[in-house]
Amino acid sequence: MRTQWPSPAKLNLFLYITGQRADGYHTLQTLFQFLDYGDTISIELRDDGDIRLLTPVEGVEHEDNLIVRAARLLMKTAADSGRLPTGSGANISIDKRLPMGGGLGGGSSNAATVLVALNHLWQCGLSMDELAEMGLTLGADVPVFVRGHAAFAEGVGEILTPVDPPEKWYLVAHPGVSIPTPVIFKDPELPRNTPKRSIETLLKCEFSNDCEVIARKRFREVDAVLSWLLEYAPSRLTGTGACVFAEFDTESEARQVLEQAPEWLNGFVAKGVNLSPLHRAML
C-alpha cells in the first residue's frame, strides 16, 4: 500500500546573524513558520531491506539525495538499537513543488518527512528527540521540520523554542535563480555581529533578514522581485534566498497582488501555519 506524506515549506519570518564560530558555522536567531504548501512524498513499503528513490533529482547521485540519506540513517540507527523490523525497506517518490536553493527548506523538509514517516510505518518507536538529533546530522533546518511546530531558533538553528506567531497569508515569489547557501554566508560584507535579543524583544520589532542585503546586491533578480513586492506589502527574503515573500492579512489580498504580478515573476499564495501539515496529517 502506498501512503502520502506532506513535506511543507518554511519561511524565516526574521533572520539575524549574531556571530561566527571557530568552525566557520554562523550563529543566528531566526523565527521559523510553516506554510500549508510544499512537496508530497509517497512511500510504499518493501520487505527486502532496500531503499529506492523512484524520482531521482537531476545532477544528484541516488545515495547523496537527502531523502535516501535520511532513510538509511533511520534504518541504521533503529537497527543498531534493535528497533528495526527484519526486511524493512521502502520505495519513495516525491511530487516536487518547492524550488531548490529557494530558502523554503525543501530538502530539509523532505528529509524530516522521511524520518517521521518511516519511523511510523516501520514501527521503530524512536522519539521525536531521537529523530531531531538524527536530523541535525543531515542539516541544521531538519530538526524544526521533525518537531513540527513554529519555533524561535538559536545556535546554528538547532536550539528551538516553540512559539505561535500570527498565521498570516503570504505571497511567495521565486526570482528564477538558485542561491547556494555558502554564496551568502561566505560574502565578506554579510552582517555577522547583530546583537542577540530575547524572543520577546524580537517579536515586538520590525522583522528583517540580515542576508537580504547580500542577496539583493549579488542577484539582481532578487532585488527586482523585492522592489516590486514592497510596493504592495511588507516583504523580505526567506533564509538565504532566493525566494522572497510578502505578508497579508487575508488570502484575497495576497491573490489580488499575485494577479497583478509581471509575467517574469513566478509565485504562489499560502497560509502560514504553526503546526506542520505533516504533524497535522498524523493526528
Swiss-Prot record:
Pathway: Isoprenoid biosynthesis; isopentenyl diphosphate biosynthesis via DXP pathway; isopentenyl diphosphate from 1-deoxy-D-xylulose 5-phosphate: step 3/6. It is an enzyme of class 2 (transferase). Signal peptide: none annotated. It catalyses: 4-CDP-2-C-methyl-D-erythritol + ATP = 4-CDP-2-C-methyl-D-erythritol 2-phosphate + ADP + H(+). Its EC number is 2.7.1.148. Homodimer. This is 4-diphosphocytidyl-2-C-methyl-D-erythritol kinase.
